[in-house]
């Protein structure tokens, strides 16, 4: 891999990990090399946006050790997003274990220290219940996959000064502005 030429895009790695929620309980972790999923054409995620995702990175340090950046924080936010979308709640431990396992099994894709590249992890969860009408999904799939990536902005970014107001919130109460769901991003294409 030419680490210096990587952009922010998907590159196949060896495995991804999955948990299935059916019949009121989570499955054991499944490790697979399959990049595809099979689901019903009326799955709730396809029609009603019952989908969420996270994004975090693994880095190799100057000492050669691999470090995950804020994995527990991402796991808690994933749970918060799942709760908001009425999806089954994975434990923080499940999400952390999935992230650790996908990094461990794809260690060859972690860029060397100093390249500016990283291993990007994408936990994604969605309702898989077949049906019509907006209602909570009874079934779900949680996947964690990864990809080596370069900088999101290849040309870099210019820092700016901002004021942060922790007393005000622009997100609508009980809306989706403070959770990480795909629908929040679709409008950016307009």
Language model feature labels by segment:
Residues 114-126:
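Extended, Lys/Arg-enriched charged tracts that mediate electrostatic binding to polyanionic substrates
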Residues 108:
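Non-catalytic nucleic-acid-binding/docking modules located in mid-to-C-terminal regions
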Residues 112-113, 137:
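Charged mid-protein connector segments
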């Amino acid at each position: 891999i030419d680490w210096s030429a990587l952009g922010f895009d998907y590159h196949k790695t060896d495995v991804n990990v999955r948990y299935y929620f059916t019949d009121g309980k989570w499955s054991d972790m499944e490790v697979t090399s399959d990049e595809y999923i099979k689901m019903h054409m009326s799955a709730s995620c396809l029609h009603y946006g019952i989908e969420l995702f996270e994004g975090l990175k693994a880095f190799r340090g100057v000492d050669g050790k691999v470090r995950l950046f804020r994995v527990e924080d991402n796991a808690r936010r994933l749970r918060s997003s799942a709760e908001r979308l009425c999806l089954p709640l994975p434990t923080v431990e499940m999400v952390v274990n999935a992230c650790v396992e996908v990094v461990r099994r794809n260690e060859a894709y972690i860029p060397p220290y100093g390249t500016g590249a990283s291993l990007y992890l994408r936990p994604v969860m969605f309702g898989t219940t077949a049906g019509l009408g907006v209602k909570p999904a009874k079934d779900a799939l949680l996947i964690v996959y990864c990809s080596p990536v370069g900088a999101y902005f290849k040309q870099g970014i210019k820092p700016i000064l901002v004021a942060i107001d922790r007393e005000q919130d622009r997100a609508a109460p009980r809306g989706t502005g403070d959770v990480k769901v795909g629908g929040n991003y679709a409008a950016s294409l307009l």
